[in-house]
Amino acid sequence: WSKNNGGAIPPNMLQIPNTESNSHYLKMCKLLGIKGHPARFPAALPEFFIKMLTDESDLVVDIFGGSNTTGMVAERLKRRWLTFELSKEYVAASAFRFISNETVASDIYSKILSDEFAIIE
């Protein structure tokens, strides 16, 4: 496994630092007084697998969406994506991964919680 095979076989251990505590998502949660998802992981983790297993425009599905790190990475890598999450609060807060404006983020968060239709562009 330690031999470089030119990418044919991925390594059996990924070394990815967890810098999630400095993320835009958490900053927006704190700014708006919202509790963020407790089990976040670094974007480099889904990025590794999305790049290895999919091509642009492929569909990425995350059945335990949480704060939607996987959806954010899939979007950035030009993949289509679906995310499922039981907690409406986590779904609403996951919009922060795609929004930089505090006022817009607060509005989208409220709309999702009140079952209003919201489009993030």
Where are the regions that the model predicts?
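Class I S-adenosyl-L-methionine
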Residues: 1-121
